[in-house]
Amino acid sequence: ISSTLKADDWPGWFGPERDGVWREEGILDKFPQKGPKTIWKAPVGRGYAGPAVADGKVYIMDRQIDKGAKSPENPFSKITIPGNERLLCLDAKNGEIVWEKSYNCPYSISYSAGPRTTPLIDENRVYTIGAEGNLYCRSTSDGKEIWSTDFNTAFNVKTPTWGFSSTPLIYENLLICLAGGEGTVAVAFNKSNGKEVWRSLS
């Protein structure tokens, strides 16, 4: 990539247009024989979540299991595994941790490695949904919680076999999520304060 270009942001799942298309100009059309040069590396815990990039920061979720705990050899097993889910904010220039936030989150799902959803960046907020249905809105500057909810308790739903795995969608002033449950398959929140605006589908 040309050093004179500023890389486009990738603020959520499938990019800024949600279509998986990279529109930046001047990118490589093929990698060097020995692969692209590594700029930095950063340790990240377990999980399936992809990174989001915005305003010089990289956001990614992972999971840290409690000391002495371990995931079952059979990925379909649904035993309870104690641990925390975590959101990391890294400096895109050097990979150093800017801030991190974690919360207690025992897993009782199949394929229990970690979170599934990519963080979503909108203005000065970052939204995350954990595998057990914990939805958080945090400040991008320091990770401070702005609002949160728990799908299991708020909508009386059970965590799906594979966990909650749908990244939320921003539409105008709404944050739209797939919560599941009777009448709450899709739920829209005010993206700023977390108040429910509507719910739909069974």
Model region roles, listed by residue range:
Residues 5-202:
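Noncatalytic, solvent-exposed loop/strand surfaces
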